[in-house]
């Protein structure tokens, strides 16, 4: 990296409030604290006073914590220390694979400190105190990125930064709410897939958190160890939040992570109006849709929030509302970024698919909602390949979740993706003295069975295809690594309806100067349901390059 590029970063580091931000620590003196002494019951069950961590038979980790902000952080960190450190290792090893140079890692660390310089000014004091407590149990291994407290703060903006800076396709969530005529018993029912994908290891240790703060409303949240923000959750009052990434400009500074806005909503809102008021006062740095459900209102709305705009989308004369990854409110009607995103991404396709599935299943029960969230077909039941991001089930969800706010019931998917058993939790029981009377947090009699697809040959083929995809990509970029036609034909047959197997095979043949074979593969890819306009244009560019090579050979 040239000195010309380094110089601005050095300037940033010692300007714009960076020095102040990197030395900042929250004031913890107002809070009492008992340092947790963990009781190890077995290799997957731990306790401290009335705080617990255990792994259920579906392999979901369940955490119950209570206390003031500082105590919550310490209790969380002490109980989940090994899981949290493992999660941090998985996340930052991904960063290290992108930036292997130690020198460039230092530059990245400086950039992050500059980029996140205003974050601490936009996060509630109590959450900073909680993060401070949690960070006492973080590893020192990644101090080159930032000190432990700041690093934990930065990680809470990872979802936001990921889709803002890289516009990652790995953030493409789907959620819906139905009530009255569209639900089986007329009650509000909400479902969502959280398609935030780092890698399979990152999704391995799912954490179902039950949090009982000294101030505010107890709530359930589903995410990963080390996370105090909320991406999917419901409070004891029956207010639900789920977040879906929108299309964003690249912001100049990180402010309030959306997951901490939704945490505040769960902790302090009892209805939709209170949730809207919290969202309105928040200074976010990316665009996000927040689907809010409310037992008190027996309704759901979508808050569409961005750095310079705020919109509300209500279902007019309807008892259903859908949210994918584009905005629908009047406030964004003329937003060019949003319009372009609707045309070029897979968001509108999934939106239409939700409408198609609701017509098919009609009055939804939790079981029917699970079937919708697991659906892998395209519009009109077209086979579009397993793992296609145009599907509701993209086979990459970190988790899937179903809420029944009026009954205070929550169903959380177990691995893999949303295919495993949905485990039922009754908040009426969990946030009462009855919570562990039967020896578990779950109300297992109400679980939703795993998807039969788990045991199918198609799923085995899909997993093999993913492994072989990596081999094909590696061979494409390695000059002296060759694959046989037999190998490549088998690779394509494993997921024959998916455009990407033909595209990757075409790139492989092109790299080995087999242009006629490459041409055939790119043409085949273009006959399939391609995920985005950008993907289609990329294939066309590769095909045009190949056609020129074919002509030259003649």
Residue spans of the language-model regions?
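A generic structural signal for short, solvent-exposed coil/turn residues
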Residues: 8, 182, 214, 233, ...
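An acidic- and aromatic-residue-enriched active-site/binding cleft used to recognize and process polar
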Residues: 17, 181, 193-195, 246, ...
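A general structural signal for short secondary-structure boundary/capping elements
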Residues: 222-224, 235-237, 286-289, 308-315, ...
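C-terminus-biased signal that marks the final domain/tail of proteins
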Residues: 16-164, 266-289, 295-300, 321-554
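Internal mixed beta-strand/loop scaffold within catalytic domains of large alpha/beta enzymes
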Residues: 151-261, 277, 398, 402, ...
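Bacterial Sec-dependent N-terminal signal peptides
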Residues: 1-22
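Short, surface-exposed beta-strand-loop junctions and turns on beta-sheet-rich folds
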Residues: 196-198, 248-249, 308-310, 416-420
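Extended amphipathic alpha-helical segments with heptad-repeat/coiled-coil character used for oligomerization
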Residues: 301-322
């Amino acid at each position: 990296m040239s000195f010309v590029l380094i110089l601005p970063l050095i300037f940033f580091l010692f300007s714009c409030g960076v020095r102040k931000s990197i030395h900042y620590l929250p004031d913890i003196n107002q809070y009492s604290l008992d340092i947790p002494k963990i009781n190890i019951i077995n290799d997957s069950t731990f306790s401290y006073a009335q705080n617990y961590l255990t792994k259920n038979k579906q392999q979901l980790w369940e955490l119950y914590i209570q206390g003031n902000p500082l105590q919550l952080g310490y209790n969380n960190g002490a109980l989940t220390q090994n899981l949290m450190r493992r999660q941090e290792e998985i996340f930052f090893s991904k960063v290290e694979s992108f930036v292997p140079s130690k020198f460039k890692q230092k530059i990245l660390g400086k950039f992050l400190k500059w980029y996140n310089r205003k974050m601490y000014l936009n996060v509630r004091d109590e959450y900073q105190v909680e993060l401070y407590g949690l960070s006492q149990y973080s590893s020192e291994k990644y101090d080159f990125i930032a000190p432990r407290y700041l690093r934990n703060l930065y990680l809470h903006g990872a979802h936001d930064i990921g889709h803002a800076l890289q516009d990652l396709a790995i953030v493409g969530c789907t959620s819906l709410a139905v009530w009255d005529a569209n639900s089986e018993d007329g009650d509000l029912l909400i479902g969502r897939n959280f398609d935030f994908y780092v890698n399979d290891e990152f999704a391995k240790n799912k954490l179902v958190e039950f949090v009982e703060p000294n101030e505010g409303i107890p709530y359930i949240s589903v995410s990963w160890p080390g996370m105090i923000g909320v991406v999917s959750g419901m409070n004891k009052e029956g207010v639900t939040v789920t977040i879906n990434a929108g299309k964003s400009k690249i912001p100049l500074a990180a402010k309030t992570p959306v997951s901490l806005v939704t945490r505040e909503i769960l902790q302090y809102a009892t209805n939709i109006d209170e949730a809207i008021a919290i969202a309105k006062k928040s200074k976010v740095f990316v665009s996000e849709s927040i689907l809010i459900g409310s037992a008190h209102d027996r309704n759901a709305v979508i808050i569409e929030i961005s750095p310079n705009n705020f919109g509300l989308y209500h279902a007019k004369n309807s008892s259903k509302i859908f949210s994918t990854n584009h905005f629908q409110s009047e406030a964004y009607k003329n937003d060019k970024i949003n319009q372009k995103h609707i045309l070029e991404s897979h968001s509108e396709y999934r939106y239409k698919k939700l409408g198609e599935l609701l017509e098919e299943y009609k009055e939804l029960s939790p079981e029917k909602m699970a079937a919708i969230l697991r659906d892998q077909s395209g519009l009109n039941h077209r086979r579009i390949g397993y793992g296609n991001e145009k599907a509701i089930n993209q086979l990459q969800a970190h988790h899937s979740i179903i809420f029944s706010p009026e009954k205070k019931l929550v169903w959380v998917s177990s691995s893999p993706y949303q295919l495993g058993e949905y485990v039922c939790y009754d908040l009426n029981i969990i946030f009462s003295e009855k919570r562990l009377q039967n020896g578990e947090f779950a109300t297992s009699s109400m679980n939703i069975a795993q998807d039969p697809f788990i045991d199918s040959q198609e799923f085995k083929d899909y997993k093999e295809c993913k492994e072989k995809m990596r081999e094909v990509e590696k061979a494409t970029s390695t000059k002296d690594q060759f694959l046989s036609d037999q190998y490549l034909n088998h690779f394509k047959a494993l997921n024959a309806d998916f455009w990407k197997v033909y595209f990757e095979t075409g790139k492989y043949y092109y790299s080995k100067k087999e242009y006629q074979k490459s041409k055939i593969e790119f043409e085949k890819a273009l006959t399939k349901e391609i995920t985005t306009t950008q993907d289609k244009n990329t294939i066309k560019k590769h095909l045009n390059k190949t056609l020129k090579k074919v002509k030259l050979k003649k």
